[in-house]
A protein has these predicted regions:
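Extracellular, surface-exposed repeat architectures
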Residues: 57-63, 160, 200, 207
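Bacterial N-terminal signal peptides that target proteins for export
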Residues: 1-9
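Structural signature of tandem-repeat unit edges
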Residues: 40, 44-52, 70-86, 97-130, ...
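Bacterial N-terminal signal peptides
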Residues: 9-19
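A short glycine-rich, aromatic-capped structural motif
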Residues: 60, 65-69, 79, 88-89
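Sec-dependent signal peptide cleavage junction
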Residues: 18-40
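Short beta-strand/loop segment at the start of cytosolic alpha/beta domains
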Residues: 33-66
Length: 214
């Protein structure tokens, strides 16, 4: 009898050892962060960002290849570091630019898969001064409030956040001087952001304002 129980116990141990860790996590109620959904994006460390001379060009190819071996689509969570002074044109997308190629940043043409930013924080971006053209254009995964109040942004170039249809609010920094690359393109910055309920300047005396300039 003891011999039989011992055999059963050994079999159970062997079976458990082959259960994937992810399956155990799901059964125990823990969330699995694998980047496969917008609700569970992979947090990008600073070394996962392609940064040169204070300019953020995109996501570093080497880091991306390591976290996306299946070369599918992944969702990312990005916190802009304090040392970044500029987000380059298309800097938060996987679209192709010659600057990205030059600075080892991922594009959809690299055969490494694709990505979309599902969470974006500017809380630590105290050195940020410029957000380039089409930086996050067409992103529908980003939700909630785009809060730039901790930054020193003075320029947001044309179409930077156009088509971010699920943003509900924007808080602009007091340092902002230029919205759009020129006066005729100012409206393009948040064009197509259909979910927006308000745009405010940080420190506004009227927190119920739909749009207020300093």
């Amino acid at each position: 009898m003891r011999s039989r129980l011992l055999k059963i116990l050994i079999c159970l141990i062997m079976i458990i050892s082959y259960i994937p860790i992810t399956a155990i996590s799901v059964e125990s109620g823990e969330s699995v962060v694998d980047g496969s959904t917008a609700g569970a994006p992979i947090a990008v460390p600073e070394e996962g960002l392609a940064i040169s001379g204070g300019t953020l060009y995109g996501i570093d190819k080497t880091w991306f290849a390591n976290v996306n071996p299946d070369k599918g689509k992944v969702y990312l969570a990005i916190s802009i570091p304090s040392g970044v002074t500029e987000i380059n044109n298309d800097g938060l997308k996987d679209s192709y630019t010659s600057d990205k190629k030059l600075h080892n940043a991922v594009t959809y043409m690299d055969g490494l898969g694709s990505f979309s930013v599902a969470a974006l924080s500017f809380d630590d971006a105290t050195g940020l001064e410029t957000i380039g053209e089409q930086a996050l254009q067409g992103n529908s995964q980003l939700t909630g409030i785009l809060d730039l109040s901790a930054t020193n942004v003075s320029v947001i170039k044309k179409s930077a956040f156009s088509g971010c249809s699920n943003l509900t609010g924007v808080v602009l920094p007091k340092t902002l001087k230029e919205l759009g690359s020129r006066s005729s393109s100012a409206g393009s910055v948040f064009n197509g952001c259909e979910g927006l309920r308000y745009i405010r300047v940080a420190g506004s005396s009227n927190q119920n304002a739909v749009f207020e300039l300093p």
